[in-house]
Regions:
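Conserved, mostly hydrophobic/aromatic
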Residues: 42, 73, 117, 151, ...
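Single conserved hydrophobic/aromatic residue that forms the stacking wall/gate
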Residues: 301-319
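N-terminal beta1-alpha1-beta2 module of alpha/beta enzyme domains
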Residues: 1-51, 146-149, 301
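Flexible, glycine-rich active-site loops centered on histidine and acidic residues
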Residues: 1, 59-127, 171-172, 177-181, ...
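Short, acidic/polar
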Residues: 1-10, 156-162, 277-286
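An alpha-helical appendage that flanks or caps ligand/catalytic pockets
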Residues: 103-140, 181-290
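Hydrophobic faces of well-ordered beta-strands that scaffold small-molecule active sites
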Residues: 19-21, 51-53, 81-85, 151-154, ...
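Active-site mouth loops of central-metabolism enzymes
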Residues: 1, 56-63, 145-155, 212-214, ...
Length: 319
C-alpha cells in the first residue's frame, strides 16, 4: 500500500490537480473497500492536491452514510474533496454487495442517491424513494465547500451523460482499451446531453487511460506485458466467469492470449497512453483538441519493480 502514497506525493510534486481513489470489494488486485479511508490517509500526507472518489458505488451505500463520510473527508482535508459517484463495475461485486441487482440496472441507484446526498448536505431532509426510505435526518458533519464539493459522474452511456448534465455534474469517462473513436463517441454523447438540456451547463470532461512512458524497447515490453497481464486477470470479472481465488482473479497465461486482437501489442500501444514523451504529448494534444479538459493518468499495477517504474513514468510525464 505504501507505493500508492509515494505515487500520490509524486503527483502533487509534479503538478497534478486531482488524485482519485476507487471502490472495489473482495478483490486483492484493487484493494479499495472504502475510497474515503485511503483519501483520508493521502490527505494527511499532502497539502494541495485535490482528493476524488472515482467512484463511490451508489448501490453499496446508504445516503446518510455516504453524505457523512464524504463531508467528513472534505472537512479534514480543508475542502479538497471531489465527489465522484457511479453505478459500479463488476457483476461479481454486485452478487456479493447487493445480491439480485444486475449491473445494467445499477444506474437507478445512482439517480436516487445523489439528490438525497445533496439534500442531506443542505440540512434536514426526509426521503421516501424506491430504494431507500428514512425519516428526517441530515448530514453530520457538512462539507466546507459551498454549496457542496464538485460533483462527478462516471459515464459511458447516453442515460448517464444525460443525468450528469441534468444534475450539474462533471463527467469522467474511461474507454478501457478501445481506440480513439470510443473517446469521440463519449464526447458526442456528452455534447448531445448538453444540447438536450438547454446548453445551460458545461461540465469538466475528464478522460482516463492506462499510461506508461518509456524510451526504449525494454520499457515498451514491460508496459505491454503489464497491461496484458492486467487484462488477462480482469477478463473474468468483466465476463463474470467467477475465477477468483482468495481475492485474486485467475491469470490467463500470456501465451494463451497471443493472437487475440484485444491483447495485440501494437493495438494496445496505439490506443493507450503508451510511448515516448513525444508520442504521448501528441496523443494528449489529440484528446485536448477533442474537448477533453482533464486527463486521468491510470497507472499500470502489474509492472515489474513497481515503485521504480512508476517513478520513472510519472517523472517523465510531469516534465
Amino acid at each position: 500500500m505504501r507505493h500508492t502514497l509515494d505515487m500520490v506525493q509524486m503527483a502533487e510534486n509534479g503538478g497534478f490537480n486531482i488524485v482519485w481513489a476507487a471502490e472495489h470489494h473482495a478483490l486483492e488486485m484493487t484493494i479499495a473497500p472504502n475510497p474515503f479511508q485511503i483519501l483520508t490517509w493521502w490527505a494527511a500526507e499532502t497539502e494541495n492536491i485535490r482528493l476524488g472518489t472515482a467512484v463511490a458505488a451508489a448501490a453499496y451505500w446508504h445516503p446518510i452514510n455516504l453524505a457523512g463520510e464524504a463531508a467528513f473527508l472534505d472537512l479534514i482535508s480543508g475542502g479538497r474533496l471531489e465527489f465522484g459517484i457511479g453505478s459500479g463495475a463488476y457483476q461479481r461485486e454486485f452478487d456479493r454487495m447487493k445480491p439480485g441487482l444486475k449491473q445494467s440496472d445499477a444506474w437507478q441507484y445512482l439517480q436516487e442517491v445523489l439528490p438525497a446526498v445533496l439534500k442531506l448536505w443542505e440540512g434536514d431532509y426526509e426521503h421516501n424513494g424506491k430504494f431507500w426510505q428514512f425519516p428526517t435526518s441530515t448530514s453530520v458533519p457538512k462539507p466546507i465547500q459551498k454549496p457542496h464539493p464538485p460533483l462527478w459522474v462516471a459515464a459511458r452511456s447516453p442515460v448517464t451523460f444525460d443525468y450528469a448534465i441534468k444534475n450539474n455534474c462533471n463527467v469522467m469517462s474511461w474507454p478501457l482499451t478501445r481506440g480513439f473513436s470510443e473517446a469521440e463517441l463519449y464526447k458526442q454523447q456528452l455534447d448531445e446531453a448538453i444540447q438536450k438540456n438547454g446548453d445551460t451547463f458545461k461540465p469538466i470532461f475528464a478522460m482516463m487511460r492506462h499510461t506508461a512512458l518509456y524510451e526504449n524497447e525494454k520499457g515498451r515490453d514491460q508496459a505491454i506485458r503489464a497491461i496484458q497481464t492486467c487484462l488477462g486477470q480482469f477478463e473474468n470479472l468483466f465476463r463474470n466467469l467467477g475465477d477468483v481465488s482468495d481475492g485474486f482473479p485467475k491469470q490467463i497465461p500470456l501465451d494463451e492470449l497471443q493472437g487475440r486482437k484485444e491483447y495485440d501489442a501494437n493495438m494496445l500501444e496505439e490506443n493507450l497512453m503508451f510511448g515516448s514523451p513525444e508520442t504521448v504529448i501528441e496523443k494528449l494534444k489529440r484528446y485536448e483538441k477533442l474537448g477533453v479538459d482533464e486527463y486521468i493518468y491510470l497507472s499500470l499495477i502489474h509492472i515489474s519493480e513497481p515503485t521504480r517504474r512508476y517513478a520513472i513514468s510519472y517523472a517523465v510525464f510531469c516534465l
